[in-house]
Amino acid sequence: MSTSELVFIPSPGAGHLPPTVELAKLLLHRDQRLSVTIIVMNLWLGPKHNTEARPCVPSLRFVDIPCDESTMALISPNTFISAFVEHHKPRVRDIVRGIIESDSVRLAGFVLDMFCMPMSDVANEFGVPSYNYFTSGAATLGLMFHLQWKRDHEGYDATELKNSDTELSVPSYVNPVPAKVLPEVVLDKEGGSKMFLDLAERIRESKGIIVNSCQAIERHALEYLSSNNNGIPPVFPVGPILNLENKKDDAKTDEIMRWLNEQPESSVVFLCFGSMGSFNEKQVKEIAVAIERSGHRFLWSLRRPTPKEKIEFPKEYENLEEVLPEGFLKRTSSIGKVIGWAPQMAVLSHPSVGGFVSHCGWNSTLESMWCGVPMAAWPLYAEQTLNAFLLVVELGLAAEIRMDYRTDTKAGYDGGMEVTVEEIEDGIRKLMSDGEIRNKVKDVKEKSRAAVVEGGSSYASIGKFIEHVSNVTI
C-alpha cells in the first residue's frame, strides 16, 4: 500500500501545536495511506511545547528544530514571526529532503499554519502543493481576504483606520465591523499590516484552506468563502478540532476537580485568559472586586505578568495575597477558588461550570461551544477582538465585558485602559442570567458535535480534503 506523506508546519507558540496534532490524528484515522511529519520550530521564550501534545500515533512523527537564540535579534513586535519563519527555511528544506531520501513515500504536500505560509516557497522547490490550516475563525479569514483585495486592487490602506470610528462592510460578517475591533497588526504602519495582508495573499495562492470551524458556528462566513466567485481556493471546514483527552493527572488538577465536584450545577464562573493572559495589579483588583460583588461562585486562573522588557509566558504567583485586595481570599473562601494554570477543557466539561470569562482565543471559543458553556468576552490581543465581535454581535453566543479591549495600546485606542469593576460585574451577571445566550450555546453545542461524526458536514469535509490531496497537482 503506497503512502502519501504530508508535512505539517505549525506556527511557534503554545496555541498552535495542539490543533495541528489533532488535525493530523484525524487525517491518519480516516485514511491509512497517509503519513504525517510535523516540523516544530521552537521558540526561545517560555517552556518548550508540552509533550502531552505529542501522542504516539502510527504514521505520525515529530521533528524538532532546536531553539536558535540568534532569532532574538529578529524581535519587532508585529513582524517578528515573519522573520522567524524566513530564518527557518533552510532547516525545513533539509528536513524534507531527508524525508524524501530515506522513506519510500510520495511527498503529497505541505500543510502550513497562517504565519508559516512563506514555507510554500520550499514546497514549490519540491514540486508539491501547499495548503493552509487556518486555526482561527472563517470570518477572520474572510476579513483578511477582503482587506488584501482592497489593498491590491483599490490601493486601500487599512492603517488609516487607526483611531477611527469607521465601520467596515466585510462580506464574511453580517453586521458592519467597527475599526476598533480590528487586530492591531492590521493597523500597524511599521510593517505589521503589510506582513498580515501579504500572508492573506499567500493563503489565497494555496491549493486549499482547512478551517477549524463548522457550519453550526460560522455558516455565513463559510458560505462567502465557498461562493466560487472571489478567487479563493477550495475551503474545507473541518471543525471543531479539539483535544478532548484530559491527560493531566497531578495534585493541583485533582484539587481543582474535587472543588468543582462540591459546587452546584452551572453555578461557577470560570475566569481564564489563555497561555499569554495576565493583568497588572490594578486590573487584578478590579476583577476581584467585581467577582465579589457579583456574589457568584468562581474559579479564577490568575497568572503573574512578565516584565515589559521580556517576551515570555506569564508565571505563577508565589503569594496570591500580594496582588489581591486585602482579605479577598478569606471573604470568598466558601464560594471561590483562585488558581494558577488551569486544565481548561476539564474545567469547561464539568457540570458545575455555568459561564466562562474568556480572552476569546479561537481554541478556547471552540472548547466553550463544544461544552455548551456561555462566554463573557474580554479579548486581549491578536484576532481576539474579532472573535469577541463575532460571539457578541454576530452570533449572540456571549455577553460583553469589553469587546475592544487591548493589552497593548500601540494602535492608538484607549481600549487597553483598565476595565472597570462595573463593566466586569455587569458582564458576569449577564453571563450567568441570560437564558437566551445559554439556549443558543446549547444549540451550537449539539450541532457542532453532530458536524464531526459520520454524516456531519465537517466529517464530509475531511473526506473531501483527503480526496483533494490524492488528486491535486501543483
Swiss-Prot record:
Disulfide bonds: none annotated. Pfam families: UDPGT (PF00201). UDP-alpha-D-glucose binds at residues 275, 341-342, 359-367, 381-384. It comes from the Eukaryota. SUPFAM superfamilies: UDP-Glycosyltransferase/glycogen phosphorylase (SSF53756). Its EC number is 2.4.1.-. Transmembrane segments: none annotated. GO terms for molecular function: UDP-glucosyltransferase activity. CDD domains: GT1_Gtf-like. Keywords: Glycosyltransferase, Transferase. May glycosylate diterpenes or flavonols in leaves. Belongs to the UDP-glycosyltransferase family. This is UDP-glycosyltransferase 71E1.
